[in-house]
Amino acid sequence: MSRSSGASFAQFFPAAPRAARDRATERERARMRAQASPPTQPLDTNGHRTPLSSFTSNRSDDGASPGRSHITSLNHSSSAGADATRPPLEDTESLPGDTLNTVGSASSHTSTSSSIFSSSTRQPAMASASVRNSHTHNSTTPLTTAGSPSSLYLSTSLHAKPHSVSPHHADKQNGLTPTLNGSATDSLVPLPDGTERVPPRDPSRSVLCTICTYDPLLDKKLSSSEKKKAKPIYKDYGLNDEDDAPPSDPRLAHGGKLSYINVNFHLPKAQLIDAPSNLKPYPYDPKTSCGPGPPVQILVRGFNPLIAFTKVTTIFASFGDIAESSNKMHPETGSYLGFATIRYKDSKPTSSRPVPVPAHQAARRAVRGMHGRRIEANQVRVEFDPEGRKSKALMEAVLKKSRETSQTPNAAYKIPTGPKPRAGEVIPGPPPTAPKGPAAHRALGGSEAGWTSTKPRHPNIIETEPIVNHIKSEPYIFVAHEYVPVMPTTVAHMKKRLKQYGFDDIRADRTGYYIIFRDSHYGRDEASKCYNSANDTAFFTYSMVMDLHLFGTVGKSSRSSEDHRRHSYGSEKRPPPEHRQRDDQDRRRRDEEADIEEEKKQRAKNLDPVKEAAEVIRREMTEHLLKTIRTKITLPAVFDYLNPVNHAAKRRKLNIDDSHSGTIPSIVFDDSEGRSSPVGTPNSRADPIERRTARADVSTLRVRKLKSRGVNARKHGFNDPFARARPTQRVDLRSLHHRLNSDSDDDSDDGVDNRYSMIRDTEEPESRPRSRVSSEEDRNKEETGSWVAGEDDSMTEASFALNDTSALLKKRKLDLPAETAVKRQKKAEELFEATIARIETELPSQEQAVESVTPTGVEAPLNGLPDADVKAEPAEDKETEDSRLPTPIPDNTKPKKKAKAKKKSKKQIFEEREALKKQQQETFEREALRAAGIEDIEGTPDAEAKSQVGEPEPVPEPELETKGEALEAPETESKPDLDPELYPSEVVDALVLPKDFNLDIGTLKLVPFHGEDGPDAQRLQRKFGTAKLDCDAELWLWRRNRIRQLNSEDGSVDKPVGIGGYYVPNPTGCARTEGVKKILNSEKSKYLPHHIKVKKAREEREKNAKNGNTNSVAAAAEAARLAADSLVAKGNSRANRVNNRRYVAEINDQRKNFGQDSDVLRFNQLKKRKKPVKFARSAIHNWGLYAMENINKDDMIIEYVGEEVRQQIAELREARYLKSGIGSSYLFRIDDNTVIDATKKGGIARFINHSCMPNCTAKIIKVEGSKRIVIYALRDIAQNEELTYDYKFEREIGSTDRIPCLCGTAACKGFLN
């Protein structure tokens, strides 16, 4: 479209401020001119003259909007120029938005015209447009446009009926062509001839409406009283011509003053206002609104389809209640597509959401809150989908895409066909007997070629020329095509299969595969390794038979004898018989596997679940029956038959020794001549460490002795019964566990009977604290010096490899009386924690006594000083004492001091005296021995040292009679000048003790001690250091006697405080070797206070039941005791009363608020006043809960707190607890659907045990809408009394898994269930 040459800036930009002012001025002038001279022709709505002769439509060039139509004549030369220069006559022509909207105009939102004119012009215009080109007209009928209102002003005097003439014929009559300027041909509408037209306005003016020009209620200048008195002013609208004109543009009112610009200055950025704002829509109300209503369904897409859909629904459920959610799946594959629809529903107010949320509001909040957000790592899009059309469109798009993908095959995965053979060319293939390849690679045409290429870019994987001609000296392995068919895809699989071997390349031709290696020593090694490992192994369904050539084709002779196969293209030779047989076996195996699979499929198809379940149950019952017969019938019968007690008569009949029938057999030691011991273990040569750590009985250990290879080979160290030859010396080392059982080696080396030695070993470590044993060892080590290399622990690994050349001398056995004395002496040490003087345990015969007292290998001390630290030892005693000492002697010429002396009986002392009578020694030897004996005597008393360091029961220790004093007896005969009181001529007992003597502080007063018998205080102070008691010695002694008097039944102070049967020896000698064993209740009842109480109560009830409750005195005493306990329980302390008064005011306030709900009141009171309770070990079962103060009846004690779970979850947890080994589960049922689980999350109330006569009860109360479990007191509960209540399990009489009840009350039912 071309524009006129005279177009100005104002024509192209009519909305400019200056152009607006000019156009307003022109309109005022035209209005004044029109009023001065009234028009002779009718005016259109734009103020133009409308001639009735002929009309046409054309676009004006004066800057009017494209929607405005100007009525001009068909003579373009005259009217066009006049219209182009004529200014507009009305205000409606000023701006595009001010024109009267007709059919085809812009939106009604962009116009400020009156709705009256719009309605009056739109109806006839549409009527004329509907009959366009359908009615006839003559030459007098004008043509008009669909948007022109000028046809409305036609004279009403033209009344002509329409003729039935075609539009084409009418055009010929009028001499008009249907094609006019521009697009006006489409809007030409011939009016019917003589049609009576309705005028747009009624010629007679009428009142259209009434306008309020003044409203006193809106006048801010008037007061309230004046507003009531004043009356509004109304004006009729429609009587004047000005009322027909559209209202003026309010934006032009301030054009001259403010230079109006169409912007909003109240915002930070100038915002262009194109149209007036629309009214706010009314909120949706289902009662009054019409239509479907706002959307309640949304579409969510873009999330990961692999995540759990519950995560998506959980996120969107935060905006409102979800009525329905659908995660869309592919209808054919069943895979999720990554988009879903969620429909909301109206939510009711809840505790978490007190305000109800309508469904449409929840959907709107979800769209606003989640659109563009991320779910995990993916950004999602959320939009409304009220009818599911969007989701349906997405589903159709996915299905269409999948169909297109399935219909058009992918070129990347398309298997290309190989080159077709030339005419007359025959391509050799595998022989008929060769194994067939996979079905995907078999030829479809029968006689077609046998291989294809997987990738078109590698068409020459299978080489046409023989490869063997190109291989010179490189080592290679040949795999013939008879074993593995030649196919291009097999080369890649073979490379992956043999990638662990260093080959250079794998090439293939029609004869087979060539695995080529590097021409070096490394390459030949790799080829050999590959041949040895992969030859004749399975390769898919084939057997990969290899032929190794280490030096290629021109090198040395290869290992293959079938080289001709490399030069032949298609060898007709059949495989060797062994390979053919192997192939047949593989084929049969594959056929059998196929038959088995087919049978499995048939079984699965015809499977009957009932029969299969019955078969499984039958099989399990058979296994259970066999297991029951084996464990319940067979094993007990075999054990009863093999019990040695049942065969005692038969052993006596056959004269078989009954020594092995006891529980702990004796260990018989061999002598020095090399006779082996008859006692041994089945695995006596096993690792000594394993034998040490295993749970083996002492009776199974074998004590070995070495032959004497020289007495001086190993002078200092232990005589280990398990020691072997020690070729080398070892580093000074001593393990710590030796200190825990320091006397075990002494007893075994002395040849004591194993039965009694085991008892002594197990008693000593149990009765002595570990700290005391360790401290004694340390003190002895400090006195004797540092450790020597020859000392070693007998139970370490390195000790078995060291050389031990020392010879053990003969062992002697103690008789029963002597061992009984030793045990009695040890028992006294246990009770008083004091060490008594040495009593030698050996009982030598007359010949051995002479040998034992002969000093051999001991140098005489110089000058015969009596205070020398040298002591003469017999040879045998020296050797045995050397093995018994906890520390060795640092020097060979200086014998060590004994840390712990051997204990002897009176009989042994007497026999030694007799032996010493027969031996006459020099005076200096006897003086030295006597001095050593005195020093040893001084070293033994530990009681006073214990009292100085603060031991709980320090007791001074007497000196009984030692070897040193015994050696003084012969001195009287050789030296008559000695004191006859000290050295009498006849042997008399130095200290005569009664048979019932018990070592105690009270009995020490009755023992006559000599002046030299007292301990050396300076030496003890130098050895142990000084310490102080926390009180006076007499006060300590008085407390000790008082404690003994209160804890004894008869009030005696002689008996020590102890529990009978508390110290139980371990059968193996050490608690660590016992492993884990359950302590019986019978043993717990000896030392646990609660068990003792329960045991006494049970015995008392049994006694009363046996006597028929005839003891009225005891019953009265029991009733009095219960009454006293009740009074004590009812009485509260003053502090408790003060605390009770403190809450009186608050309790009254709560009572007013809660009314009669006493349980809630007491529960709130329990929160602030919890009863002090504690948990401790219980006599009933494991842990129990105890009251720390007196509790009155009906008092609320504690709440049962735990995790609240559903019934189904509780059943699963109970099974899991039993399976995991927890055993005790703390599940408390509130109702049929709720269970409190306090097993892993809970309070101490879960430790309350069951009792058939409980003192508490459990009640379920409702607090703030939730159910709580609270424990009440059934009766008055005394302090330190255990809290119990009845579990109320359902009775399962006849069940095999009933739970025994351990409450021990008089009304005990025996079982919980």
UniProtKB/Swiss-Prot annotation:
Its main location: nucleus. PROSITE patterns: POST_SET, SAM_MT43_1, SET. One of its GO terms (biological process) is methylation. Residues 7-18, 105-121 have a biased composition (Low complexity). It comes from the Eukaryota. Residues 19-31, 194-204, 559-607, 758-784, 868-884, 960-978 have a biased composition (Basic and acidic residues). S-adenosyl-L-methionine binds at Y1287. Residues 702-716, 895-907 have a biased composition (Basic residues). Its EC number is 2.1.1.354. Residues 70-80, 130-158, 174-186, 843-855 have a biased composition (Polar residues). It is found in: Nucleus; Chromosome. GO terms for cellular component: chromosome; Set1C/COMPASS complex. InterPro entries: COMPASS_Set1_N-SET (IPR024657), Nucleotide-bd_a/b_plait_sf (IPR012677), Post-SET_dom (IPR003616), RBD_domain_sf (IPR035979), Set1-like (IPR044570), Set1_fungi (IPR017111), SET_assoc (IPR024636), SET_dom (IPR001214). Residues 1-205, 400-458, 555-607, 667-792, 842-908, 932-982 are annotated as: Disordered. A motif (RxxxRR motif) lies at residues 1137-1142. One of its GO terms (molecular function) is RNA binding. Keywords: Chromatin regulator, Chromosome, Methyltransferase, Nucleus, S-adenosyl-L-methionine, Transferase. Residues 1171-1288 form the SET domain. Residues 1297-1313 form the Post-SET domain. CDD domains: RRM_scSet1p_like, SET_SET1. It catalyses: L-lysyl(4)-[histone H3] + 3 S-adenosyl-L-methionine = N(6),N(6),N(6)-trimethyl-L-lysyl(4)-[histone H3] + 3 S-adenosyl-L-homocysteine + 3 H(+); N(6)-methyl-L-lysyl(4)-[histone H3] + S-adenosyl-L-methionine = N(6),N(6)-dimethyl-L-lysyl(4)-[histone H3] + S-adenosyl-L-homocysteine + H(+); N(6),N(6)-dimethyl-L-lysyl(4)-[histone H3] + S-adenosyl-L-methionine = N(6),N(6),N(6)-trimethyl-L-lysyl(4)-[histone H3] + S-adenosyl-L-homocysteine + H(+). Belongs to the class V-like SAM-binding methyltransferase superfamily. The RxxxRR motif forms an adapter helix that bridges the nucleosome and ubiquitin. Component of the Set1C/COMPASS complex. Catalytic component of the COMPASS (Set1C) complex that specifically mono-, di- and trimethylates histone H3 to form H3K4me1/2/3. Binds RNAs which might negatively affect its histone methyltransferase activity. COMPASS recognizes ubiquitinated H2B on one face of the nucleosome which stimulates the methylation of H3 on the opposing face. This is Histone-lysine N-methyltransferase, H3 lysine-4 specific.
